[in-house]
């Protein structure tokens, strides 16, 4: 990779307020440095101490890091635990009646669920799963609305040792099908419909469509939560109502005591080539990362009301809805709806109503709320807030400043968190009582995380120069492998051409400034980041080419002030180059086709038609040139070898 020049020059810096520092879990820079040096001095001892402090073990571990077969690292692998017990049972003796979840529906109905009640619901459902023959090691796909029941389903799987794979409710039947097939799922947990922004979206019908695609005989049970009460098709031998399944089940369910390395879940994330990657996470190491980051980054206090707006279909919803807050004993808000329904101030109303202290959302949401004006948040009482967080993509400095000044009223630290589906929890983020923040920077690695910026051989790059972001040592919360694809795991994350395969390759480019702060510059592969969601170009291109009108397609990202990036598709048709009216008709058809094949999130913002696509002599599509066309930039590449230079003009036209 050629050296990347940083074009962002941001000099503003915000030290934490003295009152915040005084009450913080990591209080002052010295506290951060002490932990960082502990990890540097005794790496395995550092993680062992944290694992003993934050995790309740059924059988204590004696071995910390097993690195006998790199990069397939194992942590605490002779210990045993249960994740659900750590999230629920351990709190019953001291805070059974504390509110675990405040749920607010799309329509505004509010339900408070205590730790005692959540434990009871999880045990009922776990016993129901067992009654269907679902056992430890079985894979269960969860395709649910953003409700308490989604968390119950995940926790129930964890309780019996089943491996869950949650699919975002906006994904299509084909996406659900691919994940069912790859996971070899025994069961699917879903609902009749989901409600978002006043609109009803089918879930059970989508599951039925997925299961009708063939080769799904492994699925013996479909469990359906009755949400809207709409009519659905039913297969009596296969389908089970949630309420029937839990009826009469005992209030207790003995947890399965599993090995620390037993998979807790797989979560499918987009890759730059081919099918989605089934990221496989362990139990103990993953939970340790979720809990320590709640403590360090979110500075958790017992009276906090925590709200992470992410859906459980994404890793943020796993770590900071389903597991992290519950493991640390927090009260959190789960919201079913959208930021602006039924009115533009819905988010601010929720913060005011529930006295939220910690608010964690995506730059996409922040940018869309900025569009509505600064006077809107000012109409609500946001004085309960003490900490703001950003997740999913780098936040541009001006959005950071709006978030800090308008929402946080210039008194709440902003924690800009860099991490990935594969890392399981925060990697680079400010401990808000210890680290000064800079708009647009995720600041410094957390204690125990050895992050660096290197060139294509693994050597450090100069300060201010761009390079590959890597993590040089294994860490407990990292993915263990890709489901059924260990070789792809090795090649993707530990390529031998970078430091001999010793470093975890994040796939992001970054640079460090004079203070050692990290600045994320974007992806180095062909994965797009649309509204904080990673989408593989190969998947979208494959969907386009599957349409009978399309001969060839290439997809790139284009910066967008609200979504971060949008999808721009360059398409060659099987018919002649269409006129404007025909092009508009085809573009509309292809947009809906992609939405049905993958999901609405992947729908191209722009589609451009050409007689062919620009390629190198070896036949590779010239993606850099396409990116320049998409962004309206001056083309600096040598285009003299193009067989048909007129295509550049054709591909500059947006439909």
Curated annotation (Swiss-Prot):
Its cofactor is Mg(2+). Acetylated. Deacetylation by the SIR2-homolog deacetylase activates the enzyme. Its EC number is 6.2.1.1. Mg(2+) binds at residues 545, 547, 550. One of its GO terms (biological process) is acetyl-CoA biosynthetic process from acetate. ATP binds at residues 392-394, 416-421, 508, 523, 534. Keywords: Acetylation, ATP-binding, Ligase, Magnesium, Metal-binding, Nucleotide-binding. It is an enzyme of class 6 (ligase). Gene3D superfamilies: 3.30.300.30, N-terminal domain of ligase-like (3.40.50.12780). The keyword Protein transport does not apply. It catalyses: acetate + ATP + CoA = acetyl-CoA + AMP + diphosphate. Belongs to the ATP-dependent AMP-binding enzyme family. Catalyzes the conversion of acetate into acetyl-CoA (AcCoA), an essential intermediate at the junction of anabolic and catabolic pathways. AcsA undergoes a two-step reaction. In the first half reaction, AcsA combines acetate with ATP to form acetyl-adenylate (AcAMP) intermediate. In the second half reaction, it can then transfer the acetyl group from AcAMP to the sulfhydryl group of CoA, forming the product AcCoA. HAMAP family: Ac_CoA_synth. This is Acetyl-coenzyme A synthetase. It comes from Nitrosomonas europaea (strain ATCC 19718 / CIP 103999 / KCTC 2705 / NBRC 14298). The gene is acsA.
